[in-house]
A protein has these predicted regions:
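Extended terminal and domain-junction accessory segments
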Residues: 1-157, 199-206, 210-228
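C-terminal soluble interaction/assembly domains
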Residues: 166-204, 208, 215-222, 226-228
Length: 228
């Protein structure tokens, strides 16, 4: 697909083929407002004021223009799960709340399985739960295809990362994704939904999924998935 800009959330990657014309051109990183709460003083909220643009690279383009590029091999064509049967559908709700339990650890864990926190600290949750490494939150079948609706009920974006298996974008903010997009970090905008499909191929065992904003992850927004 042809784009003029690419939004990269924490941990995102993108492969770009740049069409250049003669001259000097800059590649810039532009800050994105990912929402926030005033009480967080910027630590868990938006980019700091004034940090709007950073020049990453400058290209000087000259020489004879290339008439055309060779086509890409079909062996690189990614799989499209929209044409395949879905084994299960799930909804994962990403939310936030003030911690209530005095001295309890993440997910009621022990001193070794969860970090004890101030009861007044913010908690970031998935389906109302904070992370507990001793709890399996999702069990999926090896070779299955699942459709997940990622629902963000908080006032800030959550870039969601699933270890091992990439996610194909199906719908974002109520709009069907027309082109074929695979990501291993999917941004879920504030107060919005994103639907993805996942093919649980090639690997079995336990791993995690979590928000890729490390503050949110550390405050509980992570879960355990087991594929078997």
């Amino acid at each position: 697909r042809t784009v003029d800009d690419v939004v990269l959330t924490p941990g995102n990657r993108a492969d770009l083929l740049v069409t250049a014309t003669a001259g000097t051109w800059a590649v810039r990183a532009v800050a994105v407002d990912r929402g926030g709460m005033g009480m967080m003083h910027g630590r868990l909220g938006s980019a700091a004021p004034g940090q709007t643009k950073t020049t990453l690279a400058t290209f000087a383009v000259n020489g004879t223009p290339t008439a055309a590029l060779d086509g890409f091999s079909q062996q690189f064509a990614p799989r499209d799960l929209r044409a395949e049967a879905v084994t299960a559908k799930r909804e994962l709700v990403f939310g936030m709340t003030m911690g209530m339990g005095g001295g309890r650890g993440m997910g009621q864990g022990t001193a070794t399985s969860g970090a004890t926190r101030d009861p007044g600290m913010m908690e970031f949750t998935i389906n109302g739960e904070v992370f507990d490494p001793d709890r399996v939150d999702i069990t999926a079948g090896s070779g299955s295809i699942e459709e997940w609706t990622l629902k963000n009920t908080s006032p800030m974006d959550h870039p969601v990362h699933l270890h091992v298996w990439p996610m194909q974008l199906i719908e974002t903010q109520g709009q069907t994704v027309q082109d074929l997009q695979w990501q291993d970090v999917v941004n879920v905008p504030a107060n919005s939904n994103v639907t993805v499909r996942i093919a649980f191929d090639n690997f079995v065992g336990k791993t995690v999924y979590h928000c890729h904003v490390l503050d949110h992850e550390d405050l509980g927004m992570m879960g355990v998935i087991e594929v078997r």
